[in-house]
């Protein structure tokens, strides 16, 4: 067996010595590839390499289409299955080759190319990030999209802050108590239509609360009850009247007027119904006195089933 191994190992022996001592082959290798010139001295083979050298040739001849990596996997599995007695001659041969290599190349130091490969892989993975940093188009587009989304969210959150930012948060309480569903038409373009109405209602609410908060505090229950008794299609206004009654006794006037003026904006059919009696949201602030006249008109008429008519102050008539 040793003779067979020596015959197989004789061709690489002169190649290693010629690679280290022969000037022609070293010069040709250095001229062809200067980066690999210091790595021309190969490492001494270990026991597995000594054994797998002949086995690899056999397996490659038997399976010419098999990839080299698959051959290495199979050879590694077979090497693990070998016993120590079977591995012993290859281990001894590997020791002999290592001693010979140390004699021929006493100043040899193993420089693993694995580190350079891993660095190249890291550079490949980090290269797109580095390229994206100086390029302004992709970053600007990403920032623009993020800013646009952030602006839309901020606008919507601002409108919700106007809705729920009033004192005691009674609007959210009333919305939870009523629990009526929204119109399906508001799902797609509801947010775009609700924002100008919210902002207009805030200014109109401030105007109304400054001029006649007392009238709205006393008139809103009767006003909502009269709407519910006229046979309107939305039956939620009747429950809204009772809720507004309880809200009016415990909350300040501004909260009651806000709950009354904000509730019709929640559903599309309610908004269309109220537009027959009140001016639309596009009308400027001078439409607020007409709302007061409408509420006074409903206050003057008797409302059956309610005892609020006798207690309403009619000093403004």
Swiss-Prot record:
Sites of N6-methyllysine modification: 42, 117
Positions with biased composition (Low complexity): 246-261
Subcellular location: Nucleus speckle; Cytoplasm; Nucleus
Record CDD domains: HMG-box_SoxB
PROSITE patterns to which the protein is assigned, alphabetical: HMG_BOX_2 (PS50118)
Keywords of the record: Activator, Cytoplasm, Developmental protein, Disease variant, DNA-binding, Isopeptide bond, Methylation, Microphthalmia, Nucleus, Phosphoprotein, Transcription, Transcription regulation, Ubl conjugation
Known DNA-binding region: 41-109
Motif (9aaTAD): 272-280
InterPro entries associated with the record: HMG_box_dom, HMG_box_dom_sf, SOX_fam, SRY-related_HMG-box_TF-like
UniProt record, GO biological process: adenohypophysis development; brain development; chromatin organization; endodermal cell fate specification; eye development; forebrain development; glial cell fate commitment; inner ear development
Chief location: nucleus
Entries under SUPFAM superfamilies matching the protein: HMG-box (SSF47095)
Keyword Metal-binding carried by entry: no
Domain of life of the native organism: Eukaryota
Phenotype when changing residue 74 to P: In MCOPS3; uncertain significance
Recorded GO MF terms: DNA binding; DNA-binding transcription activator activity, RNA polymerase II-specific; DNA-binding transcription factor activity; DNA-binding transcription factor activity, RNA polymerase II-specific; miRNA binding; RNA polymerase II cis-regulatory region sequence-specific DNA binding; sequence-specific DNA binding; transcription cis-regulatory region binding
Residues bearing the modification Phosphoserine: 251
Free-text comment on this protein's domains from its UniProt entry: The 9aaTAD motif is a transactivation domain present in a large number of yeast and animal transcription factors.
Subunit structure comment from the entry: Interacts with ZSCAN10. Interacts with SOX3 and FGFR1. Interacts with GLIS1. Interacts with POU5F1; binds synergistically with POU5F1 to DNA. Interacts with DDX56. Interacts with L3MBTL3 and DCAF5; the interaction requires methylation at Lys-42 and is necessary to target SOX2 for ubiquitination by the CRL4-DCAF5 E3 ubiquitin ligase complex. Interacts with RCOR1/CoREST. Interacts with PHF20L1; the interaction requires methylation at Lys-42 and Lys-117 and protects SOX2 from degradation. Interacts with TRIM26; this interaction prevents ubiquitination by WWP2.
Its job: Transcription factor that forms a trimeric complex with OCT4 on DNA and controls the expression of a number of genes involved in embryonic development such as YES1, FGF4, UTF1 and ZFP206. Binds to the proximal enhancer region of NANOG. Critical for early embryogenesis and for embryonic stem cell pluripotency. Downstream SRRT target that mediates the promotion of neural stem cell self-renewal. Keeps neural cells undifferentiated by counteracting the activity of proneural proteins and suppresses neuronal differentiation. May function as a switch in neuronal development.
UniProt-recorded name of the protein: Transcription factor SOX-2
Gene name of the encoded protein: SOX2
């Amino acid at each position: 067996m040793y003779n067979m191994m020596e015959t197989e190992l004789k061709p690489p022996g002169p190649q290693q010595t010629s690679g280290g001592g022969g000037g022609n082959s070293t010069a040709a290798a250095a001229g062809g590839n200067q980066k690999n010139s210091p790595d021309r001295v190969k490492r001494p083979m270990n026991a597995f390499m000594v054994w797998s050298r002949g086995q690899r040739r056999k397996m490659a001849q038997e399976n010419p289409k098999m990839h080299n990596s698959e051959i290495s996997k199979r050879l590694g599995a077979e090497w693990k299955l070998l016993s120590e007695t079977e591995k012993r001659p290859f281990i001894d041969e590997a020791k002999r080759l290592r001693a010979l290599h140390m004699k021929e190349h006493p100043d040899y130091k193993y420089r693993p190319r694995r580190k350079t490969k891993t660095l190249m892989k890291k550079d490949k993975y980090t290269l797109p990030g580095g390229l994206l940093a100086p390029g302004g188009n992709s970053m600007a587009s990403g920032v623009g999209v993020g800013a646009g989304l952030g602006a839309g969210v901020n606008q919507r959150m601002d409108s919700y802050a106007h809705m729920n930012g009033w004192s005691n948060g009674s609007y959210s309480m009333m919305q939870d108590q009523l629990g009526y569903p929204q119109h399906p038409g508001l799902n797609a373009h509801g947010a775009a239509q609700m924002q100008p109405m919210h902002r207009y209602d805030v200014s109109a609410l401030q105007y109304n609360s400054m001029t006649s908060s007392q009238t709205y505090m006393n008139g809103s229950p009767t006003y909502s009850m009269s709407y519910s008794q006229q046979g309107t299609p939305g039956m939620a206004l009747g429950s809204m009247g009772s809720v507004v009654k309880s809200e009016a006794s415990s909350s300040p006037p501004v909260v009651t007027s806000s709950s009354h003026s904000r509730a019709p904006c929640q559903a599309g059919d309610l908004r269309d119904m109220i537009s027959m009696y009140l001016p639309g949201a596009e009308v400027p602030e001078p439409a607020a006195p007409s709302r007061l006249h409408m509420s006074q008109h409903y206050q003057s008429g008797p409302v059956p089933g309610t005892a609020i008519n006798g207690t309403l102050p009619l000093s403004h008539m």
